[in-house]
Amino acid sequence: MSSHYEAPIRKPLVTGNKSYHDVSVDIAAAIEGKANKQWWIVFSIALVMFLWGVGCMIYTISTGIGVWGLNKTVGWAWDITNFVWWIGIGHAGTLISAVLLLFRQKWRMSINRSAEAMTIFAVIQAGLFPIIHMGRPWLAFWVLPIPNAYGSLWVNFNSPLLWDVFAISTYLSVSLVFWWTGLLPDFAMIRDRAVKPFQKKIYSLVSFGWTGRAKDWQRFEEVSLVLAGLATPLVLSVHTIVSFDFATSVIPGWHTTIFPPYFVAGAIFSGFAMVNTLLIIMRKVSNLENYITVQHIELMNIVIMITGSIVGTAYITELFIAWYSGVEYEQYAFLNRATGPYWWAYWAMMTCNVFSPQLMWIKKLRTSILFSFFISIIVNIGMWFERFVIIVTSLHRDYLPSSWTMFSPTFVDIGIFVGTIGFFFVLFLLYARTFPVIAQAEVKTILKTSGDNYKKLRDKK
């Protein structure tokens, strides 16, 4: 009993007096039942957004990237803004799965599966932007170090854009393996419950012959720990490499050593906000309030509050170093952000990312589901503006006043971005109907320590 003991002060992580069988039934319900009206409405909207985005991508590829709002001064704009934003959103999944696993945090078990799915779907969206940004996406394979017949013809390993290729591909592959490994016992549970022969065959195939023997569990736990060890450095390295796209250049406002930690903190910040957005909706639609509790939402809000404070500190540090450096160009770059033509984007960023998360210090607000949902949306809007401010305001006024200009997005820029949001939700909604959205095998392991009925029984003794 002592090895399973949990202090009474800790709130239960599973409510509703659940048994092992109840957990299986509740999590399999979304897969075994029929989609409700709300699911079809949201899926239809997401599909229309996705198709609009596909149309804009086809138009871009067939006509050229001149259909975007780019000009000779602002060569990177919405494409790279959206790329960095999507990559950042993916970071929370790896952090919840890998880092919290290594720290043995039990509250991760109800949210890690959907957070990992979000990571993979976000990285897919991010990967689209560098490909279409090339202008000739049919030559995208040129950025891969493929052996060729030309001997010394090789990729430029000094290019940060090549580092992005390695970062994204490594991140996607490790996240996918980690996600699928965790899914094996859950797929096996769906397989064993399946009534239709075709469904049974599909889930048998994807569960890789899982039987639930002690040897299966031993290997499962070993592989999970090894993959967590591999994925933890990726949380830091991927967004660090993305920050090098900017930090290794000589543009004022980009050439700064604070970018790697600043980008990583911002990525975790926006990622947790997106996890909150998705899980608050999912817990309501899929009747999972007993598994994704207010306790989970509150803990994620605390992470958002802390990382928001780190991001705010980074903003202030940037301003201080620009002044302290004595470099006129650096000072102007930051002054222009706050008071120039794009002042509205800068102050939207500051309001959303620095001021709004500080409201989470108030317990009543951070335990409010409605307020948490509102703040999670605000934070993601703010993080998009942060990337826009970093990229566009640094480029539109550089060293030569004669080349100063403004950037305005076209309907194609907007369409591609809206399309990726639609694609993301199409993937997530299909996932919610075909995959177990909560790691039921892991939730069952904490039922006797963190389940409310067991805690009540123990307290009575």
Protein language model regions, located:
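Membrane-helix interface "capping/anchor" motifs
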Residues: 106-107, 361-372
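Central hydrophobic cores of alpha-helical transmembrane segments
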Residues: 371-381
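Extramembrane terminal tails and long inter-domain/linker segments of multi-pass membrane proteins
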Residues: 1-38, 141-157, 186-222, 295, ...
